[in-house]
UniProtKB/Swiss-Prot annotation:
Organism (species): Staurastrum punctulatum (Green alga)
Pfam families per UniProt: Cytochrom_B559
Any one of the GO CC terms: photosystem II reaction center
Designated name of the protein: Cytochrome b559 subunit beta
Cystine connections: none
Transmembrane segments: 14-30
UniProt subunit comment: Heterodimer of an alpha subunit and a beta subunit. PSII is composed of 1 copy each of membrane proteins PsbA, PsbB, PsbC, PsbD, PsbE, PsbF, PsbH, PsbI, PsbJ, PsbK, PsbL, PsbM, PsbT, PsbX, PsbY, PsbZ, Psb30/Ycf12, at least 3 peripheral proteins of the oxygen-evolving complex and a large number of cofactors. It forms dimeric complexes.
Topology of this chain in the membrane: Single-pass membrane protein
Binding site for heme: 18
Compartment(s) where it occurs, according to its Swiss-Prot or TrEMBL record: Plastid, Chloroplast thylakoid membrane
Function: This b-type cytochrome is tightly associated with the reaction center of photosystem II (PSII). PSII is a light-driven water:plastoquinone oxidoreductase that uses light energy to abstract electrons from H(2)O, generating O(2) and a proton gradient subsequently used for ATP formation. It consists of a core antenna complex that captures photons, and an electron transfer chain that converts photonic excitation into a charge separation.
Chief place where the protein resides: plastid
Any GO BP annotation: photosynthetic electron transport chain
Amino acid sequence: MTIERTYPIFTFRWLAIHGLAVPTVFFLGSISAMQFIQR
């Protein structure tokens, strides 16, 4: 396929965005859970 050259770039971008977004959501979720447990 001809899209093989541009595909890894999109994959790296996609992994970078989700790699930052997923832990952020999990981090916020854990913080809110800790606050609920303390109260």
